[in-house]
Regions:
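Conserved hydrophobic/aromatic pocket- or pore-lining residues that grip, position, or stack substrates
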Residues: 209, 264, 288
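Short amphipathic alpha-helical coiled-coil/interface segments
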Residues: 139, 143, 175-193, 197, ...
Length: 293
């Protein structure tokens, strides 16, 4: 049974790495004053490239195109007045997983999210027809309560410890309690994400989530990184996306929790080249802070 599942995941991953035969066909319906506004899709590169564009007419739009594989894209509705230079300040925007399938969009021009975050914009684009997007939304729902609790604890830490500390009022005991609470919630979110990756190793959503672990903002051990690498390698093989992931994983292992520090060469205040190990006292805990310019 295990071998059968491995073969199935491998087939799905190969389909991802290879070009798909079908194109995407998006039809949309937007409520509110939107006549003549431009709707476009941007890829996830830097700088992002526009892959398709159309104009909203009678509250509707339609566009067709083809992508090599499912991936994370951005939709934009440009509300810049006619005759004015387009500006991100006038964009409505959101991200989703695009695939070559028939997809529908529905939204309200008055409530859709803006390019720059606006807490008053609480609406969302309703997207149907992309199985990859459905899986992504399912994953977000699975960690929604944990994420909500984490954000709440973070807000409490800000109000009860951080801001008072700016006035030299240190609620240390409460700060420690909340810091531990945040750390525990982070641990649970990491574990839930790892479970999702292991349950869906052939999905680009899982590969993307694993990739986010390697950005340096989430603390993983070298063993956890190795485990993720092995899970994904079994179904992604030498696909370019997997090759890129492996390279980042090897770099991440060097700065993972428990890994020996990199004994890099530095310049001391006198301009002399020294090894990092020469600057560290023995038998003590040392906090290092690096600034780049």
């Amino acid at each position: 049974m295990k071998n059968l599942l491995t073969v199935l995941f491998l087939v799905l991953a190969i389909q991802y790495c290879q070009a798909q035969n079908k194109s995407f066909h998006i039809t949309g319906s937007i409520q509110g004053p939107c006549e003549g506004m431009v709707f476009k899709l941007l890829d996830n590169s830097y700088p992002p490239q526009t892959i398709a564009t159309t104009v909203i007419k009678d509250h509707c739009f339609e566009l067709t195109g083809e992508i090599p594989a499912p991936g994370f894209y951005r939709w934009i509705i440009d509300t810049t007045p006619v005759g004015k230079k387009s500006s991100e300040a006038n964009w409505l925007a959101g991200n989703f997983y695009l695939e070559n399938s028939d997809i529908t969009f529905q939204g309200d021009i008055h409530t859709l999210p803006t390019y720059y975050w606006n807490p008053e914009r609480k609406g969302k684009m309703i997207i149907q027809g992309s199985e990859t997007e459905d899986l992504y939304q399912s994953f977000k729902t699975s960690i929604q309560e944990l994420s909500k609790a984490r954000n709440q604890a973070d807000g409490e830490y800000l109000e009860q410890y951080h801001r008072p500390a700016l006035d030299n009022i240190f609620n240390t005991e409460e700060g420690i309690r909340l810091a531990r609470r945040i750390s525990e919630l982070d641990r649970q979110i990491i574990q839930a994400t790892i479970r999702f990756i292991k349950q869906n190793p052939a999905s680009v959503v899982a590969l993307d989530q694993a990739g986010y672990f390697l950005l340096g903002e989430i603390d993983l051990t070298s063993g956890q990184i190795e485990d993720l690498q092995n899970t994904l390698s079994g179904v992604w093989g030498n696909c370019p996306r997997m090759t890129e992931f492996k390279e980042k994983a090897e770099m991440a292992k060097k700065i993972a929790i428990g890994a020996p520090f990199q004994d890099i060469e530095l310049t001391d205040p006198e301009g002399k080249k020294v090894k990092l190990s020469e600057c560290l006292p023995t038998g003590k805990y040392v906090m290092l802070e690096f600034w780049a310019s």
